[in-house]
């Protein structure tokens, strides 16, 4: 299991300047909640799992997107990817992979989708495989180059309405 990380120590900011609502969301009882999930091993080391808002709850399982993305990046067809949760009436959410393909790989190939799904099933726990796979030219990113998963989720919601 993993949990949300938080901290309280000298030198930590005490507020988001000029943003009281954001401050209220992030600080509780003097602790700053990072929005990250991590787990601690037997030796006391902490391991990053992913962002709290990027944890997928599928059929009672909690799936960290970072782990699934790490597996997908090992597949030869994948240059870049983002994993998000997609609403599902039975499972709550399912794993969705948005993938930028490597040169010479063609999107729209059902066999490629099956191969990617099989690869994830064989590399990590089978319930973590992406039930939805979407191929895109590029992933939305911030100016600093971080993938904007929130934009992917918003785009998916727009498509489904």
Predicted regions and their residues:
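Acidic/polar alpha-helix N-cap and adjacent early helical turns
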Residues: 154-161
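General small-molecule cofactor/ligand-binding pocket signal
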Residues: 133-136
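AMP-binding/adenylate-forming catalytic core of the ANL superfamily
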Residues: 4, 9-10, 14-15, 22, ...
């Amino acid at each position: 299991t993993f949990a949300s990380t938080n901290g309280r120590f000298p030198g930590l900011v005490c507020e988001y300047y000029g943003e009281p609502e954001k401050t209220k969301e992030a600080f509780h009882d003097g602790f700053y909640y990072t929005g990250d999930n991590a787990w601690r091993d037997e030796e006391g080391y902490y391991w990053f799992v992913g962002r709290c808002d990027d944890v997928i709850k599928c059929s009672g399982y909690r799936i960290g997107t970072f782990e699934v993305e790490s597996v997908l990046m090992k597949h030869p067809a994948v240059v870049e990817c983002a994993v998000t949760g997609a609403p599902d009436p039975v499972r709550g959410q399912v794993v969705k992979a948005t993938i930028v393909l490597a040169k010479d790989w063609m999107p729209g190939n059902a066999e490629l989708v099956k191969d990617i799904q099989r690869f994830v099933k064989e590399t990590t726990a089978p319930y973590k495989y992406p039930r939805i796979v979407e191929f895109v030219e590029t992933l939305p990113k911030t100016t600093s180059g971080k993938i904007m998963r929130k934009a992917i989720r918003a785009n998916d919601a727009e498509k489904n309405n």
